[in-house]
């Protein structure tokens, strides 16, 4: 569904509206993080169209996709999808998730290192006489566009807003869907998809200093305000139910209202498993066509910004 966000960004760029701050959750953290280091809609469009997203997000072993059941290097696969491993790693979390997410982490690292801005460089020195590596602890406020991403600490049941750290790891934590991906551990924190707690972080980007906020909301269902007790949230079933039903509708609805412009592409019939190239192309087109419907509002915001 994130491809639709790229389509909207294309229109924002076309009208020449500058972006000074970015905050994202889940797939929005990946798009936002890449955008913050120099990727633009054209490169993101290509990336969405050319990646094998099913393999990328599921750690699928493509060489085994035609095998019903296969073992390779200590891991068992069904049609190429990893289902269990005989290898035990003491530093690997073992709760609420089937997929480690190693492949997406590796690709995020690669995309960041090769960012158009050249912000991250693997060499020992750069043009300025200093260099950063993508795995270093990075101050997100010093990126070409200041950036924040949101994750959910399942131990404390609270929001975590990343302001610094390994950007690829933080992006990976923000998209760790409960029940699908292993959580990311940082110290005592067990981190999952930020959509569990704040799926439209308008308040986060406001706190960064943004005066005018454009929110791209991929959610397709509007709900009444609903609070969920801690008892409901304990365990994997509770977390999954919490993710599906949205944790704090008062906050979500408040963030919708707080946005200066809310763009909500119509994505009924699409979901997080819409990985095919045809579906991706359709969502890119939907995002762009939706963005064009808001062209006059975007131009008005540009006028306000430039005054």
What residues fall within each predicted segment?
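Patatin-like phospholipase
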Residues: 1-25, 33-307
